[in-house]
Design a protein with these regions (language model features):
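Class I SAM-dependent methyltransferase SAM/SAH-binding core
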Residues: 19-84
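Short catalytic/ligand-binding loop motif for oxyanion handling, primarily in non-cytosolic enzymes
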Residues: 33-37, 53, 103, 131-137
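Short alpha-helical segments and helix-capping/turn motifs at coil-helix boundaries
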Residues: 9-14, 27-31, 108-110
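Hydrophobic beta-strand segment of the Class I
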Residues: 94-95
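Short conserved AdoMet
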Residues: 20, 104, 118
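S-adenosyl-L-methionine-dependent methyltransferase catalytic module, highlighting the catalytic core
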Residues: 64-78, 82-85, 108, 112-114, ...
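Class I SAM-dependent methyltransferase Rossmann-like catalytic core
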Residues: 1-22
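A short His-aromatic
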Residues: 98-102
Length: 218
């Protein structure tokens, strides 16, 4: 309704408050809730998935009921420089909401975006507090991990990242109130067992498969 729309507009205004939104911008991973509005902003939408994969995810996600999938303009294919995937034109800001935690090499990802922005541009990121998500029990990502990934340069979530996310996150079935304190992890419903997590970790290594997980915790 109107109140929901207003809340989204207020959220977008806060996120974009330091961006030159009257100039050309870039939004990474808009999915079904872009921060920018293509009817108001001159923006290029990019995602690591192509349109077909995004449509599949959209159909299978119960949280997308009543929503619309934002069409993308370019695919930032894993392992390819962003500059090779988009038009060579000046961009004056970039925005990504709830994308950063999915990135296997955070520092490298940021550098790729910096490389296509004009000097002095702004990057606006929305990163969820893990204490309000299914990552509640996970340890925050460390400086050493971020720097290590910047050296290793993984182009897809690593076996360790997959293993950690699947084995240390709980299933959000709507029954858990994150504001009232949580019981021990062992008492919560899990979507994956430790054996499942290990199996997926082995699978992504063997098949070089891109399994979308929360690679980092903030």
């Amino acid at each position: 309704g109107r109140s929901c729309l207003s809340a989204r507009q207020e959220r977008a205004a806060a996120i974009l408050s330091q961006c030159e939104v009257e100039r050309r911008g870039l939004e990474v991973g808009p999915y079904f809730r872009p921060v920018t509005d293509s009817s108001l902003h001159d923006v290029l939408y990019v995602d690591c998935c192509d349109e077909g994969e995004l449509q599949r995810k959209f159909r299978e996600n119960p949280k997308t009921a009543g929503e619309q999938l934002q069409p993308i303009d370019a695919v930032w294919a894993p392992g390819r420089p962003l500059s090779d995937c988009i038009s060579h034109e000046p961009f004056y800001y970039a925005v990504a909401s709830r994308v950063f935690e999915h990135v296997p090499n955070p520092l490298g990802w940021l550098q790729e975006i910096v490389n296509v922005l004009q000097p002095g541009s702004m990057i606006a990121l929305v990163i969820p507090d893990h204490r309000r998500t299914i990552d509640y029990y996970r340890k925050p990502t460390t400086f050493a991990q971020v720097m290590g990934w910047s050296v290793e340069k993984p182009v897809r979530p690593t076996p360790s990242q997959v293993m950690e996310f699947l084995s240390e996150s709980f299933e959000d079935d709507g029954a858990v109130d994150l504001n009232s304190g949580l019981p021990p992890f062992s008492e919560l419903k899990r979507h994956y067992t430790d054996q499942d997590a290990l199996g997926f970790a082995q699978f992504v290594e063997r098949e070089k498969y891109y399994l979308d997980v929360h690679c980092t915790v903030w």
